[in-house]
Amino acid sequence: VMGQNVFDLAYYNLIGGLSNEVFMAIPMFIFMGYICERAGLVERLFDSLKTVVGNLYIVVIIIAVLISLATGVVGASVTLLGIMAAPHMMRLGYNPKLTAGVIAGGGSMIMIPPSVPLIVMAPTMNLNIIDLYAGVLVPGLMIAAMYMIYCSFYPRPKSDEKPQYGRVLIDVLPLTFLIAMVLGSMLFGLATSTEAASFGAFGAIILALLNGRLSLRESLLKTCDTTSVVMLLALASMIFGAVFTSLGGDTVIVDALNSLPIPSWALVGCILVLCHLLGWPFEWPVVVLVFLPIFLPVLVANNVDMLWFAVCLAIVIQTTYLTPPVALTSYYLKQVVPEWDLGMIFKSMIPFMWIQILAIVILFLAPGIATWFPNYLKIDNSTVINKIEGEISFPQFENMIKEK
């Protein structure tokens, strides 16, 4: 029925996809995340920050953002926050429900770079990974700020600990150094995503050595496990995409969705809702690698800005980690804090799920939030490149070329 051409197309899709250098960054970022998880950097920062900020709800959100900026692995973030913050906050008398929600909501912020799902999403949508990282950075920080505003309305126990400003400065430097190496080098055009991931992995090893908590063997084994799952799904999705396209499945989907009597923004909303529902039974690699390519022709036909849509989709995928009854974040948290009831954890995540949905609505109303920073970086980097090209130009060769 399919013919030899289908298998030829599947083969070429497979080779072309795996030869994309963006995928080479995946194991490095995962490895960096597992090294950081065991290095003890975050625990030290939490111990010093709690004396300065006072409100541990806010401290957990700040730490969650820093973990996301340094690692981008959901399981590691939630597990680390649960082990580190939950017992201390319960001992001080913080609200258990809000504590669980803050840890789950903060730990699920996988869209903040360097994010492994974004690395996979960029080539799937034919986007530049640097543009995508820049696009999600501002909305990600916006969501973190919305979390803080929500938590600030709740009362908190008073703390008698004296602020340790000097210790905070010392403890924040290692993570700041790592984030600057990874994120700064990419956003300002100093390194590709693969090079930045390599620098980040090397930097994480150095910091773990300095902290005396390097667990290289365990980190390598976990990196191999996680990377194998992601890459296996990538291989399967490429073959599926080739067969699906050859059989005309994409045409059927495009025609069906385009025939709906609704405006393009509503069509995009329907696609995001479908992706959210698919995120319940499936992990994010399946949604991004298998189902997203099916919807791409519809988005192209309706002239949807792919960068803006990718940012919205990243938040949607992030929201699935907080949506009962399949919210994976709740099971990560239950594993490290077994005394918390699973039903209570589910209820605690719902306000943070609605905050993320509100962020998507804001992006629909003000799409420039997702696009202005990538555009700014393009202008800034192009100015630098033009200046460099002007300084190293060779007018005699340019004249020879013009004469010819």
Regions found by a protein language model. Name each.
Residues V1-K404:
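Alpha-helical transmembrane segments of multi-pass membrane transport proteins
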